[in-house]
Amino acid sequence: MSFNLRNRNFLKLLDFTGKEIEHLIALAQDLKHAKYAGTEQQKLKGKNIALIFEKTSTRTRCAFEVAAHDQGAHVTYIGGGSQMGHKESTKDTARVLGRFYDGIEYRGFGQDVVETLGEHAGVPVWNGLTDEWHPTQIIADWMTMLEHGNGKRLNQMKLAYMGDAKNNMGNSLMVGAAKVGMEIRLVGPKAYWPDPALVAECNELCKISGGKIVITDNVQEGVDSVDFIYGDVWVSMGEPEELWATRINDLAPYQVNMSVITATQNPAVKYMHCLPAFHNDETRVGKKIEEKFNMKGLEVTEDVFESSYTICFDEAENRMHSIKAIMVATLGD
């Protein structure tokens, strides 16, 4: 089956069917193989792409820049000091940039900003991350799971997400799983469970796809027999440090350590993380957390993160291939 996603925005996975998501994954796999083989064909030659980053980034920025370069496109980086939303409305910015550029990436805060860009730019707009959604990450995640899934299809896999299940990763993983028929278990304290309206919407999607959503505060129930465990940061650099104590105390029982790995009863289980991860005291934040809370590592321990269970760096590499696929599918010649 062929898909035509040309000129489509990529703002959230709710906008796409399961088959369209699988098409993007397959395209990312093809582009990855072509890059390794030295046979990549440039589909974005002569295109100009704006990268708007109101939030800082390493992986997302590098992934977009390298993917665009590989495909023959030119990029302009627009940082947090731009006039968008300050001296010029998002709507006006969209209409201006849409005259200069063939595609626009946005990474920032409210989903309403990227939706406004998508409505008014007149060119494809891609969501590099908002407070509500992180859709490009999921294409990379599902691609990585297929690489490490021992031949299983996505609809045969079980994934446990540990921690804050109401953040952008919890939302995106739940929707992504519901779209492709995967079983996902969101494991965390009740105060961190996702919005009931979104859960209801995803349960309706599961009736079509055959997926399954389990939400629990019981770690043993959540991880038993899963193929993958997924973690995300507990503390954000954008929030006051006085909130850290509450979040860390609430989420401490959901740290991924070797006991959790053992509890899966699956020797082939793999650990995933969208990165950056706080797994030791080798960063300023990690050192501060160790001094203040007497913890080496937060969402994952060092022994798990540095073990053969971890596939985080394959996952990080696949950010570039999957972002390239999204740009080629929506903008490529």
Swiss-Prot record:
Carbamoyl phosphate binds at S57, T58, R59, T60, Q83, R107, H134, P135, T136, Q137, C274, L275, R319. Its main location: cytoplasm. L-ornithine binds at N168, D232, S236, M237. GO terms for cellular component: cytoplasm. InterPro entries: Asp/Orn_carbamoyltranf_P-bd, Asp/Orn_carbamoylTrfase, Asp/Orn_carbamoylTrfase_sf, Asp_carbamoyltransf_Asp/Orn-bd, Orn/put_carbamltrans, OTCase_ArgI. Pathway: Amino-acid biosynthesis; L-arginine biosynthesis; L-arginine from L-ornithine and carbamoyl phosphate: step 1/3. Transmembrane segments: none annotated. GO terms for molecular function: amino acid binding; ornithine carbamoyltransferase activity. It is found in: Cytoplasm. It catalyses: carbamoyl phosphate + L-ornithine = L-citrulline + phosphate + H(+). Keywords: Amino-acid biosynthesis, Arginine biosynthesis, Cytoplasm, Transferase. It comes from the Bacteria. One of its GO terms (biological process) is L-arginine biosynthetic process. Coiled coil: none annotated. Its EC number is 2.1.3.3. Reversibly catalyzes the transfer of the carbamoyl group from carbamoyl phosphate (CP) to the N(epsilon) atom of ornithine (ORN) to produce L-citrulline. NCBIfam families: orni_carb_tr, PRK04284.1. Belongs to the aspartate/ornithine carbamoyltransferase superfamily. OTCase family. HAMAP family: OTCase. This is Ornithine carbamoyltransferase. The gene is argF.
